[in-house]
From Swiss-Prot:
One of its GO terms (molecular function) is rRNA binding. This is Large ribosomal subunit protein uL3. GO terms for cellular component: cytosolic large ribosomal subunit. One of its GO terms (biological process) is translation. Part of the 50S ribosomal subunit. Forms a cluster with proteins L14 and L19. The keyword rRNA-binding applies. It comes from the Bacteria. Keywords: Ribonucleoprotein, Ribosomal protein, RNA-binding, rRNA-binding. It holds the Pfam family Ribosomal_L3. InterPro entries: Ribosomal_uL3, Ribosomal_uL3_bac/org-type, Ribosomal_uL3_CS, Transl_B-barrel_sf. The gene is rplC. Disulfide bonds: none annotated.
Amino acid sequence: MKGIIGRKLGMTTIYEDGKALGVTVIKAGPCTVVQKKTAAGGEYNAIQLGFEELSPERAKKLLTKPILKKFEAAKVKPHRILKEIRVENPDEYNVGDVIDAGIFKEGELVDVTGWTKGRGFTGAMKRWNFGGGEVTHGSKFHRELGSVGNHTEPAKIWKGKKMPGRYGNERVTVLNVKVVKVDAENGLIAIHGAVPGARGGLVIIRAAKRPRK
């Protein structure tokens, strides 16, 4: 396993063998290794990566004291984002190492995790794709929920009932997407298809956990 943190820049078109491919361009890294975890130490094999380096003044405003102490102990400059990524062999990394987009190669399959666009408070039709009521003369409801349960028994609404509420801003992972282009010099990775989230949203790219055969 290997991975990197980045920001979604947007989508564009790349032509490959005469075919037009819609790709998402991601500004990946540079990320700094802040901590190593090993199974031998009673934990699991993983590394913690810092992304988007901060000045000391900005770090004091944006980070909590425990996080600042963590960077001080590792002798690494403070970073805005701190994420953990599972790896097979943590001994391949050292605290302070810098990881860039060059860890991935063109044609490789990856899993991309992002946070979907927040849509705010929405109704059941938009949130859960309900059909709604009849749009005819005499109908008393059109975009409402309908029945939500029985009357006397159980005389309550069951937990988990699909109802209006906040929609979006959820962590979503897209599996087995192809790396089309890698520009390690500029820290750019072009991934086939769409990636969850808005432009400028945080994404985590990992080597595919269950690649297609």
